[in-house]
Amino acid sequence: MDIKRTILIVALAIVSYVMVLKWNQDYGQAALPTQNVASSTTTSGLPDTATGNNAAASDDIPRAASDTSAPAETPVAASKDLIQIKTDVLDLSIDPQGGDVAQLTLPLYPRRQDRPDVPFQLFDNGGERTYLAQSGLIGTNGPDANPAGRPIYSSEKKTYQLADGQDKLVVDLKFSKDGVNYIKRFTLKRGLYDVTVTYLIDNQSAQPWSGSMFAQLKRDASADPSSTTATGTATYLGAALWTSSEPYKKVSMKDMDKAQLKETVTGGWVAWLQHYFVTAWVAPKGENNIVQTRKDSKGNYIIGYTGPSLTAAPGAKVETSAVLYAGPKSQAVLKELSPGLELTVDYGILWFIAQPIFWLLQHIHSIVGNWGWSIIFLTMLIKGIFFPLSAASYKSMARMRAVAPKLAALKEQHGDDRQKMSQAMMELYKKEKINPLGGCLPILVQMPVFLSLYWVLLESVEMRQAPFMLWITDLSIKDPFFILPIIMGATMFIQQRLNPTPPDPMQAKVMKMMPIIFTFFFLWFPAGLVLYWVVNNCLSIAQQWYITRKIEAATKKAEA
């Protein structure tokens, strides 16, 4: 039975690591070769779902369902004078041509820990990368469907900033054509990462006006600037959307390479995911929209939607809107914004364990104020919950140590006759009331918790650049000096010394190698995860030592 226990432990070690790598295959999107794409000073492109009979100015502007003509390739120079909008949490730049969000940074999230003055950049359409949020009006009279080029909006100022004591900032961009006045309004609020984009159409012409709003995210195939590079820590880079049948449907770049997706949904959202951050367009509730993914001629990947047709009689007004979110993957915020959007915080197949773990971590952190100490207290809580199971396991192992001399005698008695040896061992275990697999139960229980915590530390933006103490300045990445993994290996070795030695020499050698194997695996794991395992091992050693000594004392007393 000892060989079964050894095989089980080795298998669990291998399976845990393979599961991590397999998760990366499913959820991690390898960066594709960077395409040569147009910058914000050259061509600004849009989706492929427009409405109306006008050809689009670029192959990535949408066409309406009634439009059967192919979009025209008409490059139009975008304005170099971007409109700057700043709040306490967002810093974005609007391109007057089309009113797209061409640049966006997050002041509260430094790009690197050693450069707190350089904010992390989400949207970037400056030449080296293409990643922006686009919206417009298409269809029969939509100005963004004009083959001569997208509309050039004007604004009262070139810079807008949320002032102290001000909770809301409204920025209006204006454009007029053929007797129709358009206002593209951006509404931002203090402390929020969502921006409401509203179109107000005032038809002062003698003809009826009709059109549809589209909203989309366009990105090239460049690598995720927020991802880590350690072994086994790649995360999903790609698109996702909401449908009535699937509240969270991923569409990778490879999927877009193979085929276009086109679905009709009510409400919902479309998003682009990367490590720790997400951008999304959220459609109005109850509105029937056409969601589409595609790849344009420049190699950019697009996900977006086109809303229902709008009409305005002569002298009438009409408006429509959508919400753009660009910020961290905060589950509470995303859930409130739109159903299913919180699922972009992807904890993998063990999400049902990971979510309660994160909930506990959050509540502990609200008390102690440090994520490292939160992990330590969480570990203590988990060990307390599983103490009865652990106690039973340690009692079983203590009994195994007690019968070790008898097992050695059986081995000497039966020699190389494995069948008789196994039968004799089973009889001895039965007589002594020992469960030979009892020591494996804590490992079986802890593995799902271990893997779930791994994904919590990997996916939760709260862990990004979260310091602990001393040399651990970021719990979400590997220990820079590999001190914690070495300590973890040492605790495994000590814990192993407390366990009964397998009677078979080969098994004993395999067991001695386990701390080395685990230490190697843990070298590249997030420091927060290794911290959990170190504390877990230390508590296990204390529990096992206490229970073993208690049983030995009781045995000596009974024999006396």
Swiss-Prot record:
Entry superkingdom:
Bacteria
Spans through the membrane = 7-27, 367-387, 437-457, 468-488, 515-535
The UniProt keywords, alphabetically, are: Cell inner membrane, Cell membrane, Chaperone, Membrane, Protein transport, Transmembrane, Transmembrane helix, Transport
Compositionally biased spans, kind Polar residues: 38-56
Q: What family name appears in the similarity comment? A: Belongs to the OXA1/ALB3/YidC family. Type 1 subfamily.
Known role = Required for the insertion and/or proper folding and/or complex formation of integral membrane proteins into the membrane. Involved in integration of membrane proteins that insert both dependently and independently of the Sec translocase complex, as well as at least some lipoproteins. Aids folding of multispanning membrane proteins.
Protein's name according to its UniProt entry? Membrane protein insertase YidC
